């Protein structure tokens, strides 16, 4: 009898050891596969696994991103966690996250005033954490709530933010006598001309990135998500050079082109300066848009307009995709204002025979 009890106890111990081994192995393989393995990162990941709550897994992910210097992603995960805790509290069990729970969560976010695109971002980050938990064996396949026939994240179509070439010309000529308006207008125009560059990449440009009359850079947004570094090259047209001459630092090889960063910032302060500049550009450009009767103009508008102006001019979508640094054409298609009102009106007019009043 005692021997049988010992045998059962040994079997249970072996199962625990095997389970722990599989969790550690899965964590190591996942981190190594993403190029982010370190003992600290492994420790953070295993802390999340040991706690067995969604909240703790989020906090482990946030700590992992902070140590990797990925402040933008860290802040997004932190924001998503706050929303989750407003909805379901500070100890969310993995088995509580069901299809019906996700529907209620999406409804809750909608009632908070979030648009579909933002709701989709929250749900995708929750799904990413559950994917980590699934790889670690914490969430069984039968428990996993996302996917075909389960909960499918509804994607927002995306706002059509593109301006016409005529509107961009009016922005370029706009003056109100304010130096701040002139500077932020020029920064916005530089974003547009520089392949719709994101502000996070704009602030990090240095004079050494200009090679043979082209600016060369790798998008910060994709440098951690792709195995091959995709370099974007932008011809420095005279209008861009004029903006550099007007607002840039002295043209020394290691200097930042624009006086936003000074090179002493840690990742968090770099992110904060980027966010501050983005807000400043958006605030000033919103005022410009109102004065010109164009509507709201933002840094996103610059990126969308770059893509759409090229498309209207007949540029190949593959070229536009490469210029934006996208990994697939579908992302680019989302950027393009394919169904603008003017295009719909033109196509509708084709249906009307001559002489039909």
Region roles according to the model:
Residues 162, 219-223, 263-264, 324-349:
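Catalytic-site neighborhood detector that most strongly recognizes the C-terminal catalytic loop/helix
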Residues 148-149, 204-246:
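Conserved tyrosine-mediated DNA breakage-rejoining catalytic core shared by Y-recombinases
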Residues 209-214, 294-296, 315-334:
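Short, polar N-cap/turn motifs at the start of nucleic acid-interacting alpha helices
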